[in-house]
């Protein structure tokens, strides 16, 4: 279990109910249980049960240390203590992961921890991770057009957005700007959670918010993507934040605003996944039309 966040309050009503649901779920698991020691909630759940913990925390049973984030990769060492022991941790080995971001270091450490719990040798698991290229819609490189790099990610909750944007800037990145395009999801979620996004875009130079992707939920009067914009502007009055509700206007804005050296990251769990292709297509057709006029 990586972390527990506020979500689906329309179903659970309170965060305490969410935590209780996870606690009951973990209790029913007969096999190995691996929990993140860096997350306060999962650490609390782990303390009540027989679990193996992982993370960057000194309290973790399996730790990622000496982390280097550069060249779009993550390199780190792994220390571990024997199961059931409180003794000092010992160096197990090193990992060279072809994925960027602290969150992927933690995910890889979780996978290593579970693999070792199941009897897989560390060197075998680490070798497998060294060739893991990630999955679709997780910092998914969608193309480079005239110097602009387009990335798409499924991130749609505040902590996910923070992790993605933080991961977009490693020691060797030289983007001119990071332009974050966020498509909020679910009217009922945004009606109670819009303010939670206020500090999620700190690592973006420009933030563009679209209208809400319904995911089958019913529109609520007054609940639009503008709520997210207002939340960001209240906490960060100097940040450039745009609210562009209509898709055609959004594509046109990005096609004309993005310049060479920019990184454009589209985020959300709706049809924003198609946005990079739409923007690239318009930019290319615009250049073709300009060339014909000469």
Residue ranges and their predicted role:
Residues 5-7, 39-40, 156, 184-187, ...:
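Short glycine-rich anion-binding loops that position phosphate/pyrophosphate groups of nucleotides
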Residues 135-137, 159, 167-236, 243-247:
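Active-site beta-alpha connecting loops in nucleotide-dependent enzymes
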Residues 1-150, 230:
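Acidic, Mg2+-coordinating active-site environments of NTP-dependent enzymes
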Residues 209, 284-294:
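Short, flexible loop segments at boundaries between secondary-structure elements
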Residues 249-282:
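A glycine-rich beta-strand to alpha-helix segment
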Residues 9-17, 189-191, 217-221, 274-276:
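Glycine/threonine-rich flexible loop motifs
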Residues 29-33, 239-241, 262:
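Short active-site oxyanion
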